[in-house]
Amino acid sequence: MFVDKARIFVKSGDGGDGAVSFRREKYIPLGGPDGGDGGEGGDVILVVDPNMTTLLDFKYKRKYVSERGQNGQGAKCYGRDGKDLYIKVPMGTIIRDVETDKIMADLAHKDDKFVIVKGGRGGKGNVKFCTPTRQAPNFAQPGMPGEERWISLELKLLADVGLIGFPNVGKSTLLSVASKARPKIANYHFTTITPNLGVVDVSGISSFVMADIPGIIEGASEGVGLGFEFLRHIERTRLLVHVVDISGSEGRDPLEDFLKINEELKKYNIKLWDRPQIVAANKADMVYDDDQFNKFREELNKLGYKNVFKISAATRMGVEDLLKECARVLSTIPVTDMEIPEEERFVPEDKHFTYTIRKEGDTYIVEGTFVDRLLASVNVNEPDSFRYFHKVLRNKGVMAELEEMGIKDGDMVRLNDFEFEFLK
């Protein structure tokens, strides 16, 4: 089964908690604190597997969580870091953040990998909180929670050449004779309902990947037929082979077919319309008058399309010349990565921890990323830890800012769900 879209939940490992521990040994009366730090949480990393061609695996498993960091221990023993979780994806996978619908990464090469969520930082053990005036801290820092998010995976096939054209014009037959691919072939519309890939070996010249793209009909850019479900697979191709039924066996005019398909490409993505095209006038074995082909070629020449081949995929007439021309044209087109527009690019959350203060009645509310991080790293119910919490607020300038705003003794200060009474 070919699956080219998936949505999964990823969560990195939480950091391990720092340890509260004191050295207790015979004949050592002043052992002091010796709590070790917690380990780092494991990352979740997407990595390209060249052997994968579909996102089918994600149809059955949608939740991926990496390992938590181990807690610190006494004797200054650090916790073990959590193991990173590697998720294999096919080459050509685009990763989007579901919440913003922005593109986070485009994994288009064999060795590409991307850290989708980073593990939480391990908490510090109580030995790290020793000062000349606080020689036996009775608190440690909890580990930071790991990141989590829903992401969507979107596969855009990596092919050098894309076969486009109306249904039943012979695209699948052409792919089957040009490569070892074995797509379903029958004499009815939409025989092909998923893209098919084949490696074409042009003897003595080169080899390239060809894709049979189904579902392009009039209105496809607006969702008609199979719609734009498969139009996106053309985006990575460097060259398009536009297959038309020159025999008009279904009562359609080949020139009109050609113009309609190009109009759909233009509506979907203007860059596709500008992509180099070779025209394959297929089913020529059913045409007994060369004037029909010559007239078609003349009209295309007027429109600027010079590469027009008369072929029959069924009898293989003209197919070899067509493939040689594909190889020649490809050699003149550089391989480039897909550009991600600035407005579609995911912007990571600002790692600079900031805060704002506002007043509601007699309560001063402090909020922001600085507050979230601070509360996650202390235990406000433990006296030593609360004093450390108060010191951080003062060193950060929060207390001074509150005083400038006119706070008085007895007023309440709220940080998220935690409140305390202000005293100078």
Curated annotation (Swiss-Prot):
Lineage per the UniProt record: Bacteria, Bacillati, Bacillota, Clostridia, Eubacteriales
GO molecular function: GTP binding; GTPase activity; magnesium ion binding
Top-level lineage group: Bacteria
UniProt binding sites for Mg(2+): S172, T192
Official protein name in the record: GTPase Obg
Claim: Membrane is one of the keywords in the record: no
Function, as annotated: An essential GTPase which binds GTP, GDP and possibly (p)ppGpp with moderate affinity, with high nucleotide exchange rates and a fairly low GTP hydrolysis rate. Plays a role in control of the cell cycle, stress response, ribosome biogenesis and in those bacteria that undergo differentiation, in morphogenesis control.
Domain called OBG-type G: residue spans: 159-331
Transmembrane segments: none
Organism, scientific name: Clostridium acetobutylicum (strain ATCC 824 / DSM 792 / JCM 1419 / IAM 19013 / LMG 5710 / NBRC 13948 / NRRL B-527 / VKM B-1787 / 2291 / W)
Gene3D superfamilies for this protein: GTP-binding protein OBG, C-terminal domain (3.30.300.350), GTP1/OBG domain (2.70.210.12), P-loop containing nucleotide triphosphate hydrolases (3.40.50.300)
Residues annotated as binding GTP: 165-172, 190-194, 212-215, 282-285, 312-314
EC number: 3.6.5.-
